[in-house]
């Protein structure tokens, strides 16, 4: 292979060991891309690329609809969702569909409707994808200039960015409208153990909403993941939706400033790397949210958080031993600290034992037993309700651990129910996907910057030093 760039397109080139390999009538010399970079053939074919994106959306929506119906078909109303390995129905239940007090599923028909709507949508998207990939115009610039683009056209790219931002803003407002006007959403903090309610008193104070962003990510602070009431969550979506829509309008109406034109790389691969970087951040944040937050991800549907299961076990044994006559306020544990209750470093009364590390847990079954200085001893003696006992015993035995030994004091038993928490699945999958997206971001950012700088990492195999060296044998 004689050139390190394509004579026809001036794109960065993959350097193959075998530069003469031709597949489907394409070879590296004429296209500038190796056989495995299949998407590269669509770089300048906006119509075909549209088809690929629409078809991909169809696959995503088809999976959502099919998996939704699969979960509905296998759903057992008598068991909690998190015991059935469900990952889609918990999201629908959190939005207030089909559930009542305590998160009990009253009606699965809304879930069926959701699955069917997604399947129908996927058929429309699939048809559109096949049409644009096979039958429609290869390029859109001539026939449909509004939908056409050139990757280097900075103004067009920011217009497309603006359209995307407006669509994201509309999505944020869909949640707001559902919570305000269309039946409400599930609130795990509703009195008596959770219920569906309309959110009437939105938090719109910027100091509260943006205060979450300024909090430390550690300990009892917990950054945005620490949000624990729906007024703040829905109010945050009002702010987010407004910012996205206003930012979208701004990007449609303006051209990039000089500093942005200089600082950013303006190529298709650069935009891919920016998108992968953003998705990576989303994945890591979602991982933390589903692992720690029991308001946006109610434990009634997703199972308890790790700290919640640990605190639930301490509470369950406190209830048991108190009934057997133990004085839970003064009993000493094996380390000399309180066996059931102790004080945190700042003086609050907290659960003793290994679960002390999770003393800043907030959960709707536990908060009614707190006073101004942490857990209230008189409430623990007189005010514990049966629903709190039932829920804590249930959460104690459904920790999202996947471990054979004790973690955070939670007794795990290898002969127990065959159980993997949806929290474990969702947190792990989003972390792993976030990581791979980050690697993809670095890869494509490096290639895009190299191409913009006028070079491409790689060795011309015709003159590779190893070719002139003595064979190993």
Swiss-Prot record:
The chain crosses the membrane at residues 69-93, 134-155, 178-200, 255-275, 291-312, 447-471. The keyword Transmembrane applies. PSII is composed of 1 copy each of membrane proteins PsbA, PsbB, PsbC, PsbD, PsbE, PsbF, PsbH, PsbI, PsbJ, PsbK, PsbL, PsbM, PsbT, PsbX, PsbY, PsbZ, Psb30/Ycf12, at least 3 peripheral proteins of the oxygen-evolving complex and a large number of cofactors. It forms dimeric complexes. Keywords: Acetylation, Chlorophyll, Chloroplast, Chromophore, Manganese, Membrane, Metal-binding, Phosphoprotein, Photosynthesis, Photosystem II, Plastid, Thylakoid, Transmembrane, Transmembrane helix. It comes from Morus indica (Mulberry). This is Photosystem II CP43 reaction center protein. Residues 1-14 form a propeptide. One of its GO terms (molecular function) is chlorophyll binding. It is found in: Plastid, Chloroplast thylakoid membrane. It comes from the Eukaryota. Disulfide bonds: none annotated. The keyword Lipid metabolism does not apply. It holds the Pfam family PSII. One of the components of the core complex of photosystem II (PSII). It binds chlorophyll and helps catalyze the primary light-induced photochemical processes of PSII. PSII is a light-driven water:plastoquinone oxidoreductase, using light energy to abstract electrons from H(2)O, generating O(2) and a proton gradient subsequently used for ATP formation. The lineage of its organism: Eukaryota, Viridiplantae, Streptophyta, Embryophyta, Tracheophyta. The modification Phosphothreonine is found at residue 15. Binds multiple chlorophylls and provides some of the ligands for the Ca-4Mn-5O cluster of the oxygen-evolving complex. It may also provide a ligand for a Cl- that is required for oxygen evolution. PSII binds additional chlorophylls, carotenoids and specific lipids. [CaMn4O5] cluster binds at residue 367. One of its GO terms (biological process) is photosynthetic electron transport in photosystem II. The modification N-acetylthreonine is found at residue 15. Its main location: plastid. It is a multi-pass membrane protein. One of its GO terms (cellular component) is chloroplast thylakoid membrane. Signal peptide: none annotated. Belongs to the PsbB/PsbC family. PsbC subfamily.
């Amino acid at each position: 292979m004689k050139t390190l760039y394509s004579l026809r397109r001036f794109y960065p080139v993959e350097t193959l060991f075998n530069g003469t390999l031709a597949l489907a009538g394409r070879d590296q010399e004429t296209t500038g891309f190796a056989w495995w970079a299949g998407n590269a053939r669509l770089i300048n074919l906006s119509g075909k690329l549209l088809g690929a994106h629409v078809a991909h959306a169809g696959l995503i929506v088809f999976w959502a609809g099919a998996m939704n119906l699969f979960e509905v078909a296998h759903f057992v109303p008598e068991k909690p969702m998190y015991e059935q390995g469900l990952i889609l129905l918990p999201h629908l239940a959190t939005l207030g569909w089909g559930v009542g007090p305590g998160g009990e599923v009253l009606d699965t028909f809304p879930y069926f409707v959701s699955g069917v709507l997604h399947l129908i949508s996927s058929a429309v998207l699939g048809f559109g994808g096949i049409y644009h990939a096979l039958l429609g115009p290869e390029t859109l610039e001539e026939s449909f200039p509004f939908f056409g683009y050139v990757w280097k056209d900075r103004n067009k790219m920011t217009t497309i960015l603006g359209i995307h931002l407006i669509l994201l803003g509309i999505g944020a407002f869909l949640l707001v409208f559902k919570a305000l006007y269309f039946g409400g959403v599930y609130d795990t903090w509703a009195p008596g153990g959770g219920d569906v309610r309309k959110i009437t008193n939105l938090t719109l104070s910027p100091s509260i909403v943006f205060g979450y962003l300024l909090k430390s990510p550690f300990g009892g602070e917990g950054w945005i993941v620490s949000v624990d009431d729906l007024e703040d969550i829905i109010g945050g979506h009002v702010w987010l939706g407004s910012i996205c829509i206003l930012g979208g309008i701004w990007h449609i109406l303006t051209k990039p400033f000089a500093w942005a034109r200089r600082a950013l790389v303006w190529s298709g691969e650069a935009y891919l790397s920016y998108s992968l970087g953003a998705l990576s951040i989303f994945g890591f944040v979602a991982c933390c949210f589903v692992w720690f937050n029991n308001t946006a991800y109610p434990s009634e549907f997703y199972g308890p958080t790790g700290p919640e299961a640990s605190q639930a076990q301490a509470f369950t044994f406190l209830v048991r031993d108190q009934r057997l006559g133990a004085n839970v306020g003064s009993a000493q544990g094996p380390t000399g600290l309180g066996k059931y209750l102790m004080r945190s470093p700042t003086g609050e009364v907290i659960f003793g034992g290994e679960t002390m590390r999770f003393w800043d847990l907030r959960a709707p079954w536990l908060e009614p037993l707190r006073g101004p200085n942490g857990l209230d001893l008189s409430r623990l003696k007189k005010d514990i309700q049966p629903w709190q006992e039932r829920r804590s015993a249930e959460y104690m035995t459904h920790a999202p651990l996947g471990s054979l030994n004790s973690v955070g004091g939670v007794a795990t038993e290898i002969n127990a129910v065959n159980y993997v928490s949806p929290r474990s699945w969702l947190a792990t999958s989003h972390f792993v996907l976030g990581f791979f997206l980050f690697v993809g971001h670095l890869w494509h950012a490096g290639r895009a910057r190299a191409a913009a700088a006028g070079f491409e990492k790689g060795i011309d195999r015709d003159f590779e030093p190893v070719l002139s060296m003595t064979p190993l044998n």
